[in-house]
Amino acid sequence: MSREKYYITTAIAYPNGKPHIGHAYELIATDAMARFQRLNGMDVYFLTGTDEHGIKMLQSARKEGITPRELADRNTSAFRRMAEVLNSSNDDYIRTSEERHYKASQVIWQAMVANGDIYKGGYAGWYSVRDEAYYGEEETEVRADGVRYGPQGTPVEWVEEESYFFRLSAYQDKLLDLYENNPGFIMPAERRNEIVSFVKSGLKDLSISRTTFDWGIPVPGDEKHVMYVWVDALTNYITALGYPDTTDERWAYWPANAHIIGKDISRFHAVYWPAFLMSAQLPLPKRVFAHGFLFNRGEKMSKSVGNVIDPFELVERYGLDQLRYFLMREVPFGQDGSYSHEAIVNRTNADLANDLGNLAQRSLSMIAKNCEGKVPQPGAFSEADKAILDQADAALETARKAMDDQALHLALGAIFAVVAEANRYFAGQEPWALRKTDPARMGTVLYVTAEVLRRVGIMVQPFIPQSAEKLLDILAAPADKRQFADVLASPLAGGTDLPAPQPVFPRYVEADEQN
């Protein structure tokens, strides 16, 4: 039976600097979504990569006295290393400087020409190098320092040049129909409202080529023009599936189920991209989900300001799964969030070390001591036993619904509510007292606790994969019985030998406490 296909992408990162926590946040979240759907039985294709053209790359390379290609090669290797360090399960890594991508971008350009949507004209307007975007005069302001800024707070300069244009104005009604008929196309709702209002206010044709630099994909038939970065960058999502070869087996993954992006690029993904695809007569993605920004103790981070946090250092300091868990649990996905050392330590120690780690350690140590290191044979289940087992099953359904809406924090919330309840169950049943008064009942309580831990272990795999694997290993859950379908289908068998219990989640101890 062929499994349902699921295609998910991150935005491609711009490698004119080093990776920062914002890049890591998007990759971790998207990786969890990809892993979740794989465990859910889907045939998943997960893409990430780097967007290597444009004037910022050229300027950064010149500053260092190297070519843009050398800069791209060097910095992209740091982004690839980040994907490895974060344990990302991406199926492909695309670079827009690759040959396959030149071909795809030129073919989609020609398809838009064939549809009558590209023409040559002259362009004059306010351009932000940092955003790689043009802004209307009304979207800019001159501040006290005498500099004119665009809506993202970046400086803009007046640019005049010959340019090719895309007839974006012709797509206004089609786009409004798209948003109207597919309310889930842009999420969360605040982003949808912003985009609808932007499109309703009237769309101007879009300048889609430049002649002032040459680090980019040449326009077919007019080589002195290179494609404006957004035609080139957005096309990466179909390049990776073999476009323009629609007989490529990967093409079956299109249209994408979800493009996961930062909210600062929602206009490009929710307005320009569907318009380009309509023009090229290609199917549209099902969803564009724009997440919020991460603030370091409430301060916005940016490469230009220089308060950028290195994700490699965070993993080194707190542990990978601890960082993954914190970012997905603490911040409602789609909203802005803040992080600090204290917040990461509190989440790690309270949820992972105390609630989940401690429960596993206590219950499995009791089994090792009192049940010959084997899963106990349970007796008849009491109401309390059934209630906690049922809550674990219900959490899977809640998590599935939450993940359909990219609500990672709600999925984790439901799973960790089971962990909290399992701790109350364990404390209330007092298996250490039952050891003397009712050893058979003690065995049932320990069985139920271990079985709840197995179900939780399966459900947390997308979020904290290495730790979940350790937990499932010490519960002797067979390696081929760890899909979501196994939560109910493959309960622990009484009499199974368990390995010696190992701590799964160490507490975070401050350096000065260790000395």
UniProtKB/Swiss-Prot annotation:
MF GO annotations: ATP binding; methionine-tRNA ligase activity
A Pfam family: tRNA-synt_1g
Keyword Protein biosynthesis: yes
Motif ('KMSKS' region): 300-304
Keyword field contains Nucleotide-binding: yes
GO biological process: methionyl-tRNA aminoacylation
EC nos: 6.1.1.10
Reactions mediated catalytically: tRNA(Met) + L-methionine + ATP = L-methionyl-tRNA(Met) + AMP + diphosphate
Subcellular location: Cytoplasm
Superkingdom per UniProt: Bacteria
Binding positions for ATP per the UniProt entry: 303
Main location group: cytoplasm
GO CC, one annotated term: cytoplasm
Entry-linked InterPro entries: aa-tRNA-synth_I_CS, Anticodon_Met, Met-tRNA_synth, Met-tRNA_synth_2, Methionyl/Leucyl_tRNA_Synth, MetRS_core, Rossmann-like_a/b/a_fold, tRNAsynth_Ia_anticodon-bd
Family to which this protein belongs: Belongs to the class-I aminoacyl-tRNA synthetase family. MetG type 2B subfamily.
Cross-referenced HAMAP family: Met_tRNA_synth_type2 (MF_01228)
Function: Is required not only for elongation of protein synthesis but also for the initiation of all mRNA translation through initiator tRNA(fMet) aminoacylation.
Protein known as: Methionine--tRNA ligase
Biological source species: Brucella melitensis biotype 1 (strain ATCC 23456 / CCUG 17765 / NCTC 10094 / 16M)
